[in-house]
Amino acid sequence: HTPTRRQRQMCIRDSLYGINVLDYLELYKKNTFVKQESYKLDHIAQVELGKGKLDYSEYGSLHTLYRTNYPLFLEYNVRDVELIEELEDKLGFIELIQSMAYTAKCNYADTFGMVKYWETIIYNFLKEQGIQTPPQKLRGQEKSKQIVGAYVKDPLVGGHNWVVSFDLNSLYPHIIMQYNISPEKMIKGKVDMSVEKLLAGKTKITGDYAVTPNGAQFRKDKQGFLPELMEQFYDERKLWKKKMIEYQIESESCKDPARKKQLNTLIKRAYNNQQVRKIALNSAYGALANQWFAFFSVDLAEAITTSGQLIIQWGEKIINEWLNQVLKTEGKDYVVAIDTDSLYITLDDLVNQVFPEDTPKTKIIDFLNTISEDTIEPVLARGYEQ
């Protein structure tokens, strides 16, 4: 019979166990953050390396090139391989994937998604402690509702001068550590709590449990496995970043070519190791909020997001109270925008009070950098200690 269109499109795919195929196109898309107008090898090579593929346009097609100029056909294919090799030398994405896989003890393919990746991390972590993970009865359960997300403030309308930004470092991992958010530590039953009530000071948390703004409660008697993993990855990342900076400083003053080459290798290795920890830290919440994750829970996910909402809006409250006091204004909103873990603050009124109109911009920028680090950051830190 004549095959249907659907049948003609079907193909057979074989899996060779023990062999992993990594598509550099997928690696590039996953690990770069600037959208390219094209992801063809020729364009990416031009962008990253300043050179592209061999041009065979005079032959019309690869088949014609193959039939009429076989040596050039071979050179064309060799050039493609060399471009991929040079891209890897510069970007190190395969080395990054290898580091991720060895850290989690998983297959290379498992690093492309965070659900399997984090399940493997947790399984091996608990296994080392003699703990068996429970059967995955709820795997693939349907979400009963949309999970509450991060807080994003609508930007204040209009143009704003002298805007500075403050980011809360690794917000979600620190929330997990702060509240001891972990599946085995969550208590059944929720209390009447909300972000709005906590911001307004209409409720007070008492008792032996850590309580998040969504009303979830967590035991504090012992650190949960998820906060412990967050702390481990965070400490390891700090260590690798410190090593990377030390190698970079030494490399800048190094005159010995052999040692400089060795230092470049060490810098790349330290960067990859800290990047692996960063990816793991930033992806933990995403896995936890995924319905296909073995430890998926709406309450756990919302414990993190609502805590993030509370913390970032508390920062907004601290900044506005302080600036209104310093600038002798009343009820003015100086926070022009908020996005998840970032505050964007206009210091235009402060600049106008301190500097005359003709002040060089570089002088104002230096002032804003200094006051941000020496004054505003400590104000935020004291405010969060409440």
Which role does the model predict for each range below?
Residues 7, 17, 159-161, 332-333:
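Conserved catalytic motifs of the protein kinase core domain
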